[in-house]
Amino acid sequence: VLLLAIVSLVKSDQICIGYHANNSTEQVDTIMEKNVTVTHAQDILEKTHNGKLCDLDGVKPLILRDCSVAGWLLGNPMCDEFINVPEWSYIVERASPANDLCYPGDFNDYEELKHLLSRINHFEKIQIFPKSSWPNHEASSGVSSACPYQGRSSFFRNVVWLIKKNSAYPTIKRSYNNTNQEDLLVLWGIHHPNDAAEQTKLYQNPTTYISVGTSTLNQRLVPKIATRSKVNGQSGRMEFFWTILKPNDAINFESNGNFIAPEYAYKIVKKGDSAIMKSELEYGNCNTKCQTPMGAINSSMPFHNIHPLTIGECPKYVKSNRLVLATGLRNSPQREIRRKKRGLFGAIAGFIEGGWQGMVDGWYGYHHSNEQGSGYAADKESTQKAIDGVTNKVNSIIDKMNTQFEAVGREFNNLERRIENLNKKMEDGFLDVWTYNAELLVLMENERTLDFHDSNVKNLYDKVRLQLRDNAKELGNGCFEFYHKCDNECMESVKNGTYDYPHYSEEARLNREEISGVKLESIGTYQILSIYSTVASSLALAIMV
């Protein structure tokens, strides 16, 4: 009787609820655990670049090569290739360009000018004071061996070094009205001689000044005559200045010596997002949507760890080395125990103890076994809802991190080192916060994703349990054992939620009562084991005899 009962139980029809498993070794971290193996994961941290300078959305960068921004704007003779430049997407300057201020000196508010350039995409150079407009001064003699061109002394192309003429330097009074609709970048300078002899040799007047005025600027400069060490063979120095002249405003110059006059000015014809990048890279004849000083990034990932300074549509920079988002389930593949004919599997195939590698068309589903055979079937509805939810997860993370901290790579002069240090600390602090937020968000979302999948499996289990009620027995491993015959049509009704409980309840009741009559517990577990042991021993003894 006991043997018949056991055989009867083994041959009962079953349906199990389970989840997908595969050979994935992808691992994620959660708030509670590290290195959780999952069926599917998505790396959301871009770590690669192409190592090249590329066009940005089809617009070429302005790569200054051996020229600095100052050398380009003033017109260092060695930077003639940049006399007229087309629209640029961003500007690239080397860390220590060779062709800077060929005549030694300073560029006043240079760092602020560079910051201004990070919002400009195109200049149009226009002539405001032609060399021929200085009849009472030498406009071509102001050259220096410090600025050579083709083996001869030369000077910056966009400004004019005015020298005395016929032993006289008449006072200059010149104005320029900006009749353009665009802002105008105007450059000028002052020469600081080495000694009084050089002062009178060049400008005749021993005491000189330069006055510059606009509606917003009131400047008066005087030369600083001093003995200095030679740089580029020069003991003198030059100091350059700039201003933005608004439309309908005028700039007025007055000077009786030492004046470096503007010949050309820059009309700002296009403003937009740009940047000045410090990079030694070469142009790669490529196109990108995101550029860094290390190279271009072509990625749809929400984060990157390549360089904090970027230009274009870029992922958000974080200091993390790893950000992996769980999109699938916990991956714990379980071997199935199959019978030769019907493929019936045992308790270890349940969702509590392991996932199914045989179910490949969904995340959650069923495995059934009856007289007609056995097989897997994904639950398409719950799987699709889960896919939709997880698909939106990356977008959700992007939305939650949609404010990019702007690391513009600002520069500071020597007098602003404390400000620079403070600025760097603030930038580092912001980046630390962004990194912490990104890492914490990923940990939390991974926890939620895995809990979400667990909940979906439980919901599917409860859906079956509530339909079958006492027409089947819960085996405790995600499987139900029917107390009645359940053919393929019956199995399908359980899966789609249309199972007819009353139709099968009488057959189930009779089988349930029959099984109850031979319950193992009526004999006792230890007695059953004892009987089995005795029978096995007797059989072994008989074989030996």
Curated annotation (Swiss-Prot):
Keywords: Clathrin- and caveolin-independent endocytosis of virus by host, Clathrin-mediated endocytosis of virus by host, Disulfide bond, Fusion of virus membrane with host endosomal membrane, Fusion of virus membrane with host membrane, Glycoprotein, Hemagglutinin, Host cell membrane, Host membrane, Host-virus interaction, Lipoprotein, Membrane, Palmitate, Signal, Transmembrane, Transmembrane helix, Viral attachment to host cell, Viral envelope protein, Viral penetration into host cytoplasm, Virion, Virus endocytosis by host, Virus entry into host cell. Gene3D superfamilies: 3.90.20.10, 3.90.209.20, Hemagglutinin Chain A, Domain 2. Disulfide bonds join 16-479, 54-286, 67-79, 102-147, 290-314, 486-490. SUPFAM superfamilies: Influenza hemagglutinin (stalk), Viral protein domain. One of its GO terms (biological process) is clathrin-dependent endocytosis of virus by host cell. Pfam families: Hemagglutinin. Palmitoylated. In natural infection, inactive HA is matured into HA1 and HA2 outside the cell by one or more trypsin-like, arginine-specific endoprotease secreted by the bronchial epithelial cells. One identified protease that may be involved in this process is secreted in lungs by club cells. Its main location: virion. Residues 1-12 form the signal peptide. Glycans are attached at residues 22-23, 35, 177, 298, 496. It is found in: Virion membrane; Host apical cell membrane. Transmembrane segments: none annotated. The record marks 342-343 as: Cleavage. Binds to sialic acid-containing receptors on the cell surface, bringing about the attachment of the virus particle to the cell. This attachment induces virion internalization either through clathrin-dependent endocytosis or through clathrin- and caveolin-independent pathway. Plays a major role in the determination of host range restriction and virulence. Class I viral fusion protein. Responsible for penetration of the virus into the cell cytoplasm by mediating the fusion of the membrane of the endocytosed virus particle with the endosomal membrane. Major glycoprotein, comprises over 80% of the envelope proteins present in virus particle. The extent of infection into host organism is determined by HA. Influenza viruses bud from the apical surface of polarized epithelial cells (e.g. bronchial epithelial cells) into lumen of lungs and are therefore usually pneumotropic. The reason is that HA is cleaved by tryptase clara which is restricted to lungs. However, HAs of H5 and H7 pantropic avian viruses subtypes can be cleaved by furin and subtilisin-type enzymes, allowing the virus to grow in other organs than lungs. Homotrimer of disulfide-linked HA1-HA2. Belongs to the influenza viruses hemagglutinin family. This is Hemagglutinin. It comes from Influenza A virus (strain A/Teal/China/2978.1/2002 H5N1 genotype W). The lineage of its organism: Viruses, Riboviria, Orthornavirae, Negarnaviricota, Polyploviricotina.
